[in-house]
Swiss-Prot record:
This is Putative transmembrane protein ORF17. It is found in: Host membrane. It is a multi-pass membrane protein. The chain crosses the membrane at residues 8-28, 50-70. One of its GO terms (cellular component) is host cell membrane. It comes from His1 virus (isolate Australia/Victoria). The keyword Cell division does not apply.
Length: 79
């Protein structure tokens, strides 16, 4: 059975760490991202909005993939 420390790690520390890593990566690549990607796809009025939405959403997808993999590994180890 998965103990409480592992549960805390999976549901608290992993999402927080992925969000922090995501924010740091997006912070340091924001100018290149805005210039090369958003300039060609989105009108200038919406660029900041789209950038913030991507900044907030993509770490959650990364978190879901990694957490699901970890949970499957724990389940395989436990069984």
């Amino acid at each position: 059975m998965i103990d409480s420390l592992t549960t805390l790690m999976i549901y608290f520390f992993l999402p927080v760490s992925y969000l922090l890593v995501g924010f740091v990566i997006m912070y340091y690549t924001r100018e290149a991202f805005k210039k090369h990607m958003l300039e060609n796809m989105v009108s200038p009025m919406w660029q900041n909005y789209v950038f913030v939405m991507i900044l907030l959403i993509w770490p959650f997808f990364l978190f879901l993939v990694v957490t699901t993999t970890i949970l499957k590994l724990f389940k395989a180890v436990v069984n």
